[in-house]
Amino acid sequence: MKAIVLTGYGDVDRLEMREVPEPRAAAGELKVRVSASSVNAVDWKIRRGDMKAWMPVEFPHILGRDTSGEVVEVGLQGTGFKVGDRVLGLVRQAYAEYVTAPLDAWALLPPKLDLKDAAALPVVALTGAQLIEEAVRPRRNDLLLVTGALGSVARSAVHAATKLGARVIAGVRKGQVPEAAKLGVESVVALDDPAMVDRIPLLDSIADTVGGETVARLLPRVRRGGTIGSVLGEPSGAKERGLVVRAIQTHADSKRLAALAQAVVAGELVIPIGGRFPLPNAREAHRLAERGGTGKVLLTA
């Protein structure tokens, strides 16, 4: 089969289309013909070598955690799925024509969800939901600020927090305030406006998707004993202020992924698409994703 292979750390020219062995579904796995995968920040950070100190890879290496497609093989002991099912999943080595992964990595695709666009969901939707439900753990009426609120992970976090009855403040940049107001949150604050930050009421918690100085400036706005949930590790100075810090690593969750897909169909959760590229054009896709923005970049079959 064809796959996009990372041949070493570096720029996008280290991504090459190659013939690689086609996988077979082991016991308890599905094999899926990939309709689309997506480019996440972790992909281009791995490619550049930003993460090699704690997430080294062996070359050649196939990137990609998101995928959607059609089941072509069900391994032994594989229940709940059949050949021909349309699925989306949190996998590994998704920049390829076929991919295999355990059953709990997959969810059936709702009929009204576009098969290719579904590849935008698994990593960001699960990360946002797990950030709220497993790290922040807000109670009803807690006042929670989500940083980087127009990002895909943060959009999912806003959705999850709202479902739990939290009062959500969307934290964005000045120029993003009008767009963030459409998220259905209690209020919006420009985190690059010191005057607005100073007016933030006392928070019960922060769901941080940005890190760095942005979250550091917000720590004084959180009540003692409040919670910082993060996808980027522990913010400096948080525990010294008497705050509870919980970081998460995204993990497969079939039931939660299925529910998030239904939320997209219902219009409750919107993950924008920022670009679509054929799989052979992975270099261009990485360039666009690396420039940033608020939309997911897809690689399509």
Model-found features: residue ranges?
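N-terminal glycine-rich beta->alpha transition that marks the start or flank
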Residues: 11-14, 20-68
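A glycine-/small-residue-rich N-terminal strand-loop-strand element
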Residues: 68-91
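Mid-domain Rossmann-like dinucleotide-binding core that forms the NAD(H)/NADP(H) cofactor-binding site
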Residues: 121-190
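Glycine-rich cofactor phosphate-binding loops and adjacent beta1-alpha1 units
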Residues: 169, 178-246
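C-terminal hydrophobic helical "lid"/dimerization subdomain
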Residues: 257-301
